[in-house]
Amino acid sequence: MNLETLYSSYFNDLYRYLLSLSCNHFVAEELVQETFFRAFLHLEDNEIENIKAWLFKVGYHAFIDFTRRKNKKNALIEEIKGLELLDNNTPENQFIERDQLSQLIQSILTLPEKESQAILLCDLHQLKMHEAAEVLGLNLNTLKSHIYRGRKKLKTILEKRGILHEEG
């Protein structure tokens, strides 16, 4: 598969993932460019079975490198810009969806890093568990534990914030 085909096939998914990590439209775009640049450099050298998981892993490492360079380990969440929403929604519904997604991502990012990354990859970006485990460099069972604990903590956080109502 050539780079142009990869770009058109995976740009949106990769952009959304990197936006959820960086919480900044411009940083996400820069990271997507960096990811595809790295892919260009290494694509022909490696035989890659699952290209989407590999691109997400490259993107994740580009984000880590960016964070280290900018010393933003504890960066606060900025306003989420440019999220693509369904065209058939009214502007009011789009605003509500964007606000709810923003609150959800803010809540996810309060979790420990491995738990938040596992939830972002599996639940928000719908990677299969084995793909997410590969991206994060974790054993599959370890990833499942992070997802379980993260979802449990996330439910508590969302209930406390009044976003999710307690059952019962």
Task: Please give the residue ranges for each predicted region.
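A short, charge-rich alpha-helical start-of-domain segment used by transcription regulators
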Residues: M1-R16, S20, F26
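Acidic, proline/glycine-rich intrinsically disordered inter-domain spacer in sigma factors
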Residues: A75, L83-L109
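Helix-turn-helix DNA-binding module
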Residues: L109-Q117, H125-T142, T156
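Residues within the DNA-recognition helix of helix-turn-helix
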Residues: Y10, H146-R149, K153
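Arg/Lys-rich amphipathic alpha helix in sigma70-family domain 2
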Residues: Y60-E78, E97
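Structural recognition of an alpha-helix C-terminal capping motif at a helix-to-coil junction
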Residues: E30-F37, E49-H61
